[in-house]
């Protein structure tokens, strides 16, 4: 089917009843709460506060509804209530600090009666122990340095005595050593004749 063939839907809206007077229509309109009025009423509405003249004119039924507190709505505390809460909190904190200070003093007094040293004496003893530990560590470092220096001086000495260079070889010894080196490969590989250079063929 083509869209042109579709029938137009006509809505029949009933006309308002003409029997009501215009004054009654205005009163009905005033009684109906608008969205703005509903928002104002739900915004921090407290039953103690007096209703505004606009709310009074809106009708008795609506006025009764506004007096009922909404359990789901959040009502922030007033400034006086916040000040009271803050004062009580500060007082509780100060009381706790005083109680802790008095308890610490009582514990210190009991410890002193039992013979425990004071905190100042304990701190002095700890400082003395730290100084002794530092002195011991410095002495150990000096010993290590001295030992390393002694090792450096003795590193040139052998097991029996100081290390010395061997005397230089004579020419004959050098020649003998070279001959030994030449003969070594023949001795090292027995059963194998040493390779000798093949004689060059005559006429080439």
From Swiss-Prot:
Where does it reside? Cytoplasm
The family database entries (InterPro entries) matched by this protein are listed as: PPP1R1A/B/C
| Sequence positions bearing Phosphoserine | 45-46, 102, 137, 198
Q: Spell out the post-translational modification annotation for this entry.
A: Dopamine- and cyclic AMP-regulated neuronal phosphoprotein.
Q: Where is the composition biased (Acidic residues)?
A: 119-138, 170-183
Per the record, residues carrying N-acetylmethionine are 1
**This protein's record includes keyword Protease:** no
Q: Which Pfam families match?
A: DARPP-32
Which UniProt keyword terms apply here?
Acetylation, Cytoplasm, Phosphoprotein, Protein phosphatase inhibitor
Keyword Manganese applies: no
Q: Where is the composition biased (Polar residues)?
A: 89-100
Question: What's this chain's function?
Answer: Inhibitor of protein-phosphatase 1.
What family does this chain come from, according to its entry? Belongs to the protein phosphatase inhibitor 1 family.
Question: What's the protein here called?
Answer: Protein phosphatase 1 regulatory subunit 1B
